């Protein structure tokens, strides 16, 4: 009995080797289950291969960056979804902000640089100094490229809504003048818009007044020096 069983097993093994090692159905499995069992190793191998390829790509990318080959991806160039990242704003608000951003992106490069920001503030009726414009950009410039991406532009309104901007700062003025659309908000919106515009003009006027005051002070000091020199010369002439 044992000899017959051993002979049967050897015969079975020889048959499998003769057929090229093809697997037969496992005992207790139907045809579909056997096919799934046969395909499982292939799927596992494919998944492992895909993971290996992804890991290899990341390692090669990191090696290139370490060797100075290629450029790291800055936050401003990463693809982001404004509707999920800036959930505090409605889709309409984000669309309006995007429309405004594109309006002043004269170079159509996806950024608002210093000169484009200068033009924007002038058109909004709140011109800024060169240092003021640089300060505005620096406050939200996360990647330190000295210009505003659309994401950084949205950060201005996030900070304004959260009360994180100074009352008379350039970014606060920009947010106030930009957030109201007179054509869609009606009389109340127009009232708020012009109130914000008046405040922005007042800030600009105060800045101009400070400059004029400094100029007047310098003129006054120069006049006093001139008068002292004249008095000294007159005093000298009396002793001649």
From Swiss-Prot:
Keywords: Acetylation, Calcium, Membrane, Metal-binding, Phosphoprotein, Repeat. The lineage of its organism: Eukaryota, Metazoa, Chordata, Craniata, Vertebrata. GO terms for molecular function: calcium ion binding. It comes from Mus musculus (Mouse). May regulate B-cell receptor (BCR)-induced immature and primary B-cell apoptosis. Plays a role as negative regulator of the canonical NF-kappa-B-activating branch. Controls spontaneous apoptosis through the regulation of BCL2L1 abundance. Pfam families: AIF-1. SMART domains: EFh. Residues 32-47 have a biased composition (Low complexity). The modification N6-acetyllysine is found at residue 233. Detected in thymus, kidney, spleen, lung, liver and brain. Highest abundance in brain and lowest in kidney and thymus. It comes from the Eukaryota. This is EF-hand domain-containing protein D2. It is found in: Membrane raft. Ca(2+) 2 binds at residues 141, 143, 145, 147, 152. Its main location: membrane. The modification Phosphotyrosine is found at residue 83.
